[in-house]
C-alpha cells in the first residue's frame, strides 16, 4: 500500500513592493535605524529596541513590539545576514508570538533600485516551518510587511521634503588667536563671551547640564539689528579634536521667524602660519517665504569673532 506523504510544514512566501524612496534609504531604516521604523509606521510597529550588539551587525539581537491581526505582539530577532552592497538584511525570529506557531521563521528584506528610473523594489522573503499543519501560512504577515513598506516610503519622502526646505549660510573669519582658545570660549566658557564683545552679547547662562557638554542648555542675551534679544540653545555636538561645537536654538526671538535654527562653529589652525580660521555654519528653516535669510546674524557672528580674537590676544 502506497504511503501518503505528510504535507510539508516548511514554507516560503514572498512579495514585492514598489517604492519611490532609494534602495539605500529603505535598507538603512532596517539596518541602521530600525528604532525609527515606529515613527514611520506607528499603527503597525510601536518600538524596536537593541538587546545585544550594534544596530545592523550580524549576531545582534533586536526586540520588536508590533500589532498584527489586531493583536499586540512581540518578536525577538537575531540579525543573520547584512549585505550593504545588495541592500539586504535577514532576521531570524528566536522568541515571541511567532514561535507559538512556527519552529523557525526567517525574514529577508532586499531592496533593489528600479532600472531606468527613480525608486526601488522591496523584496520580502519569509521562510518558515510550521509546528503543525493546522497553522496557517503567514499571508497576513506578508500583507503587514507591504503596509509597513508603504508607510516607510511615505516617511522617507516626507523627510526628503523637509531637507529641501532647510537652507544654509556660512562664512569664514580669519583670526590671530589659536583654534583651541577660540573654541574654548564657546565650549568651555561662553559666559566669558560677553566680556569680549559686550556690545553684542550681554550674558550667557547655563540652564541645564555642564558647559560644553552635549544636551546642556544655555541661555543668551544679545543685541542684534539694534534690538535686545534672547536665545535658549541646546548643545547638539562637541568635537574638541576638530574644535567644533553645534548649538540648536530651541526658544527665543529666532523661533518667531524660523522653524529650526542650528549654528555650528568650527575653528581650524591656519596652514603654515600662526592664527586660525573660524567657520560659521547656519542651517535653518524659515516659517514662510517673507522671512529674510539671516545674513545680518552672520555679520553679527563675524563681529563677535573679531572681538573675541582681540580679547584673547589681550589676555596673552
From Swiss-Prot:
Disulfide bonds: none annotated. SUPFAM superfamilies: Bet v1-like (SSF55961). Transmembrane segments: none annotated. This is MLP-like protein 34. The gene is MLP34. It comes from Arabidopsis thaliana. Belongs to the MLP family. One of its GO terms (biological process) is defense response. Pfam families: Bet_v_1.
